[in-house]
């Protein structure tokens, strides 16, 4: 899981407490629980109900604003862009972070090559599900308003920016049956992956990971 890579920068231990916001079924947290991390919680208001796993992991049908305890790490893996009140949410994050705590936010960003190239067919535009598309500047402004600092940004875009956008250009829904039986050749897929890597190196990828601290 690519999301696990972000923890390599955070010195995660068994005792590190992690809150994952907008976690869905909690697959990432489940992997961390199996790896030995003890204090984990997932929250997602769009789940049908609370989830309790056999290994002790809990995923609650809640908003982050309903959480009261402090956390060493708070993560948003492509959930922050679905939140209608990002400023208030970041303020809550600032209040919930423990001393020396960290927040990790993975989101699509602009400007980027994919937006400039595909325009309204850019797969990450995703209206109306994405309330906001942030830039490095807007994220820094939001963070500063609530007393947080962005200390690291990594571009982590993937081939989806091409595959998904090309499907939209052809008027094929992303989740349509024929989009799963790929219309792209192996050569095209390799080219998409290579292009995504190059864009990340040049800070032109269509998504990034923001690391924040108090």
Residues covered by each model-derived region:
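Bulky hydrophobic/aromatic packing residues
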Residues: 59, 111, 122, 188-189, ...
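Short N-terminal helix-initiation segments at or just after the protein's N-terminus
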Residues: 3, 20-23, 148-161
